[in-house]
């Protein structure tokens, strides 16, 4: 009987320990994983909506600039660089998930035309490899090699990101043509304000959920605040929880209104999107253009020679 009780107690303790560890993992892991741009693909088949808006803007609410530079034209089956610049003030610090201040990270999504894709390592020149460094690029989906995602990576080191791109060859891909194609880019700096599941991060403004008077504000042991608002109309108490990070703006006894900001806006980052155009050039057209230019130059040379010959004939006739 005692042995059975001992086994039962051990079983309960093991189950309880596993449950606690699982809860700790879920609580601590979720905010970190959701911060990666690649996790945005869980809710969107395509990162660019029909309106042209890139879905990263759903989580990164502030509007910031981004720039992309690509060659004007490129030949088939050629590796070229798409340089994405994500500028921001290197001196600013962002609010981390634990409420402390830290350096900003950056991320980007590059939407290429169908057929264009990330260049394989064996096609990269030493110069491009040096520019890429230790960056690790990923496809938005295994079936969408033309959409490339990177980040988050340290912003101080990678505010300029070089994407090595391989152009397609219409000779081997029938759905690719020698045309002018658009390229779209989205770039983030800093953490988002909304997680992909719709919940707010601590990198956000927190507003009052009721109109009334701030009756009590309690600073939590691990950071953040618990704000008690007493509704003046019915005396009902409403408690607003402020996570670590945002700076509290209200004090006890202060009258506030519904949706009034309780905290400052800690966000120093944001998202921007841009576009560029690139021409997939037919080598035969280039050769034809070169031959045409060469023929014009030769024609000019022959014209000059003919003119000089004519002048000599005229001069000789005048001497007679």
UniProtKB/Swiss-Prot annotation:
Compartments where located: Plastid, Chloroplast thylakoid membrane
One annotated Gene Ontology cellular component of this protein: chloroplast thylakoid membrane
Signal sequence range: 1-35
Principal place of residence: plastid
Membrane-topology annotation of the record: Single-pass membrane protein
Matching InterPro entries: Cyt-f_TM, Cyt_f, Cyt_f_lg_dom, Cyt_f_lg_dom_sf, Rudment_hybrid_motif
Stretches assigned to coiled coil: none
Keywords: Chloroplast, Electron transport, Heme, Iron, Membrane, Metal-binding, Photosynthesis, Plastid, Signal, Thylakoid, Transmembrane, Transmembrane helix, Transport
Subunit structure: The 4 large subunits of the cytochrome b6-f complex are cytochrome b6, subunit IV (17 kDa polypeptide, petD), cytochrome f and the Rieske protein, while the 4 small subunits are PetG, PetL, PetM and PetN. The complex functions as a dimer.
Protein name per Swiss-Prot or TrEMBL: Cytochrome f
Species this protein is from: Vicia faba (Broad bean)
Gene from which this protein is expressed: petA
């Amino acid at each position: 009987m005692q042995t059975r009780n001992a086994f039962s107690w051990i079983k309960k303790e093991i189950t309880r320990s596993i449950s606690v560890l699982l809860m700790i993992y879920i609580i601590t892991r979720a905010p970190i994983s959701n911060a990666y741009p690649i996790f945005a693909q869980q809710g969107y088949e395509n990162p660019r909506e029909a309106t042209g808006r890139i879905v990263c803007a759903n989580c990164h609410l502030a509007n910031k600039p981004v720039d992309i530079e690509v060659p004007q034209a490129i030949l088939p089956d050629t590796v070229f660089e798409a340089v994405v610049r994500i500028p921001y003030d290197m001196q600013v610090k962002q609010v981390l998930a634990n409420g402390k201040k830290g350096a900003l990270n950056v991320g980007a999504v590059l939407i290429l035309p169908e057929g264009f894709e990330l260049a394989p390592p064996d096609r990269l020149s030493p110069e491009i490899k040096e520019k890429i460094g230790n960056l690790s690029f990923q496809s938005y989906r295994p079936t969408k090699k033309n959409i490339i995602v990177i980040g988050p990576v340290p912003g101080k080191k990678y505010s300029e990101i070089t994407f090595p791109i391989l152009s397609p060859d219409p000779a081997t891909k029938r759905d690719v043509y020698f045309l002018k194609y658009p390229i779209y880019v989205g770039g983030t700096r800093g953490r988002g304000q909304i997680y992909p599941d719709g919940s707010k991060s601590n990198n956000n403004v927190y507003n009052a959920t009721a109109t009334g008077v701030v009756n009590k504000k309690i600073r939590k042991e691990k950071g953040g605040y618990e704000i008690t608002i007493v509704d003046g109309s019915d005396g009902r108490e409403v408690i607003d929880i402020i996570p670590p990070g945002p700076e509290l703006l209200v004090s006890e006894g202060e009258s506030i209104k519904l949706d009034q900001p309780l905290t400052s806006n800690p966000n120093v980052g944001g998202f921007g999107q841009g576009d560029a155009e690139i021409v997939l050039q037919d080598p035969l057209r280039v050769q034809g253009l070169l031959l045409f230019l060469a023929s014009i130059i030769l024609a000019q040379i022959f014209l000059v020679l003919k003119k000089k010959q004519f002048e000599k004939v005229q001069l000789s006739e005048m001497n007679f």
